[in-house]
Structures are given as structure tokens and as C-alpha cells.
UniProtKB/Swiss-Prot annotation:
One of its GO terms (molecular function) is heme binding. The gene is Steap1. It comes from the Eukaryota. It is found in: Endosome membrane; Cell membrane. It comes from Mus musculus. This is STEAP1 protein. The modification Phosphoserine is found at S28.
């Protein structure tokens, strides 16, 4: 069956997506004899009672089915980013003090080092969710039409955006859990006693630092709101939930609220850094701290998003996505392909 070329609206394609129940469909078919009886909901258990394993998946299909095909690229990217960030943080937090001052901080690896890796991976994966959409808009502007296929690598990337987003939410939740575990660490309690002893030695009655208090209150609040929006995005990506939404509702949540969560995560990292941007001691072996590297890609994505929202570009993108074609660019592309 061929789909007509007139069906190009995403909302129409959303309505065409099958949402029915398999049992209701099988019950409504006009089969005769025992087959129709077994397909009724009340007697469906009789059909599954005999040779369940043989009917569920034939032996020849067990060898041809792929194992998590849509998750391969996102998991590989997440593993690479996690490994590189871990080695980078290990070099800064553990190896550097060991080499320069013979101080051993290996106890930081299970919690502190890992908790610097998690936010870096989470915000980078979230940026990778929205970067291909902006690249696709640039490609459409360059081609002057929406009917020309995207490059294979971009097409594969766009199909994996859901998995990138779910992995980002997973790492963000781990980051929140690890952060909440800070006061439970024995090393933190020892450090707290040392800070109190130093305060007594310095004869300080109040150790309140106004700007540090504001810094922590703001970035914790931003982190909570950003994680809540990420949770909403993760819930709406569940098929049963997305099927209950209209195209406009689903598109609004995934696109608009997704960018808001990326913005909140970026500001969360910037406020966490506070005045460390100009602190020379933060640069170990001329290497910047991880939060400086973490905000680079999200900031680039947000800048590109703002640029594409300019009226001169936004109107043209909307016209192209509605079916308009730039004849001059199409003819130029055809002439270049012939040459």
C-alpha cells in the first residue's frame, strides 16, 4: 500500500500511527470456527496454554532479531564520553596532587570523581538530543527543500534522539542521588570537624559567606527544576503516554520544554562555577575544570537555537517544512550533481 504524497503534515502522520489494542482487533475480525473462538478475550488463555514458546518466537527468528539496535549508538557515545571524562577528572583530582605534593586522594574516586563525570555526561547527551534538529534545519535551508534526504549519519542520529534523552535523564538522576549522598560520607564528617576546629582556632563566631550561600541555593534550585522537566520528558516518551497526547501536545513538550531543561542545566553549571572562571588555581596542568568543558556544547546548541529563531530564518524554515521549495537552490544543486 502506498501513502499519497499529500500526507506530509506531521500532525496527519501522528494521527495515522496505529494505537489500537491487539485483542480488540483480533476480536473484530470475521474468522470462523475455532480460530475466532480462541481470539476472543475471554478464551485467549486457551491459545497461550499450548506450546507458548513455539508460538511466541520461532527458532529461525531468534537468530535474526537484533539486540537493542536503536540503543547501540547512544550507549557507545555515552560510554566514550564517560570514559574520557573519568580519565580527565582522575588526572586532575587524583594524579596531580599525588605527583606534585605526594598526597593520596584515592578515596574520592567512588563518589566525588564519579559525581563529576555524571553531570558532564548528562548535559552533553541532552545537548546531543537537540543538536541534530538544528543541523537538519541548516541542511534544509541549504537544500531549499524538505524532500531531499538527509545524510545517512544525520538520519541515524535523529532516529536515536529518544535514546539519547533517556540516557541523559538516567545520568542526571544518578548525579542527584550521588549529590544527596555527600553528607553521609565519613570523609565529609571528618572535614566538617576540621572546619569547625579551624573556626575555633581563628576565633570566628560566624562562618557565614553570603555569596557562597546564594550560589548554592540558586544552583540547587535550578538543578531540581531541570531534573523535574527531564522526568516529564522521559514520561511522555513512554508509548502509552505519547499515544494519549495529540501531535501539538507531544511536540510542545519534547521541543519547547526540552530546550528549557537544557537551558536550566547550562545555567545550573554556570552558577555552580560562580567565580571559578577567573580563578587560576582551577587550571591544573593548564587543563580547565570539567564544568568549563561541560557547558561548551550546550551553549553552542542554545546559540544555534537562538540564531534559527530569528524571523529571517524562522519564516523560511517554516515555509520549507510546509512544502515550499527554493527553485534557485534546487536548480543549482541539480547542475552541480550533473557536473
Amino acid at each position: 500500500m502506498e501513502i499519497s504524497d499529500d500526507v506530509t503534515n506531521p500532525e496527519q502522520l501522528w494521527k495515522m500511527k496505529p494505537k489500537g489494542n491487539l485483542e480488540d482487533d483480533s476480536y473484530s475480525t470475521k474468522d470462523s470456527g475455532e480460530t475466532s473462538m480462541l481470539k476472543r478475550p475471554g478464551l485467549s488463555h486457551l491459545q497461550h496454554a499450548v506450546h507458548v514458546d513455539a508460538f511466541d518466537c520461532p527458532s529461525e527468528l531468534q537468530h535474526t532479531q537484533e539486540f537493542f539496535p536503536n540503543w547501540r549508538l547512544p550507549v557507545k557515545v555515552a560510554a566514550i564520553i564517560s570514559s574520557l571524562t573519568f580519565l580527565y577528572t582522575l588526572l586532575r583530582e587524583i594524579i596531580y596532587p599525588l605527583v606534585t605534593s605526594r598526597e593520596q586522594y584515592f578515596y574520592k574516586i567512588p563518589i566525588l570523581v564519579i559525581n563529576k563525570v555524571l553531570p558532564m555526561v548528562a548535559i552533553t547527551l541532552l545537548a546531543l538530543v537537540y543538536l541534530p534538529g538544528e543541523l537538519a534545519a541548516v541542511v534544509q535551508l541549504r537544500n531549499g527543500t524538505k524532500y531531499k534526504k538527509f545524510p545517512p549519519w544525520l538520519d541515524r542520529w535523529m532516529l536515536a534522539r529518544k535514546q539519547f534523552g533517556l540516557l541523559s535523564f538516567f545520568f542526571a538522576v544518578l548525579h542527584a542521588v550521588y549529590s544527596l549522598s555527600y553528607p553521609m560520607r565519613r570523609s565529609y564528617r571528618y572535614k566538617l570537624l576540621n572546619w569547625a576546629y579551624k573556626q575555633v582556632q581563628q576565633n570566628k563566631e560566624d562562618a557565614w559567606v553570603e555569596h557562597d550561600v546564594w550560589r548554592m541555593e540558586i544552583y540547587v534550585s535550578l538543578g531540581i527544576v531541570g531534573l523535574a522537566i527531564l522526568a516529564l520528558l522521559a514520561v511522555t516518551s513512554i508509548p502509552s503516554v505519547s499515544d494519549s497526547l495529540t501531535w501539538r501536545e507531544f511536540h510542545y513538550i519534547q521541543s519547547k520544554l526540552g530546550i528549557v531543561s537544557l537551558l536550566l542545566g547550562t545555567v545550573h553549571a554556570l552558577v555552580f562555577a560562580w567565580n571559578k572562571w577567573v580563578d587560576v588555581s582551577q587550571f591544573v596542568w593548564y587543563m580547565p575544570p570539567t564544568f568549563m568543558i561541560a557547558v561548551f556544547l550546550p551553549t553552542l546548541v542554545l546559540i544555534c537555537k537562538i540564531a534559527l529563531c530569528l524571523p529571517c530564518l524562522r519564516k523560511k524554515i517554516l515555509k520549507i517544512r510546509c512544502g515550499w521549495e527554493d527553485v534557485s537552490k534546487i536548480n543549482r544543486t541539480e547542475m552541480a550533481s550533473r557536473l
